Design a protein with these regions (language model features):
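Conserved Walker A/P-loop ATP-binding site and its immediately adjacent core
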Residues: 46-47, 60-84, 88-93, 97, ...
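Conserved pre-motif I regulatory segment
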Residues: 1-40
Length: 138
């Protein structure tokens, strides 16, 4: 069903194989289609956008919008421990840190977690318009 690139990416997350529900959702996601996924808590929804990000061409950006800062922080820390390029962007950051993250992710891509209100900022909208945004997760 998938090319061989998916298996090393799965190993990044310590996973040998996908659940049936994840496989059903991942097929259209990898084909670049819009997908609405409804799985139970702990059902593996995050993997459905994290895994494809590892398979994207270099510089591709996945935007993850979440109003829950604790969830953003936990996911970013877990991704960083696995060597995945990820960061969160929120109002707690200094102006210079905010600008550094935007510059980095606009060029290098990865998983960027944002609170929805970040889109009110002109600097965020400008940076994202110049970036190669591959997918948006809400």
């Amino acid at each position: 069903m998938y090319n061989n690139d998916i298996y090393p990416a799965l190993q990044t997350f310590g996973i040998e194989r996908l659940r049936k529900e994840q496989e059903r959702a991942l097929t259209p996601i990898l084909a670049g289609r819009d997908v609405l996924v409804r799985l139970r808590t702990g059902g593996g929804k995050s993997l459905l956008y994290q895994l494809p990000t590892l398979l994207d061409e270099p510089g591709s950006l996945t935007l993850v919008f979440s109003p829950l800062r604790a969830l953003q922080r936990d996911q970013v820390q877990a991704l960083e421990r696995r060597g995945v390029h990820a960061a969160l962007l929120n109002s707690d950051l200094s102006t210079s840190m905010h600008a550094d993250i935007l510059r980095d992710f606009a060029v290098n891509g990865g998983l960027l977690y944002l609170a929805p209100e970040q889109l009110r900022r002109e600097d965020v909208r400008t940076a994202l318009a110049a970036a190669h945004v591959r997918r948006v997760v809400v």
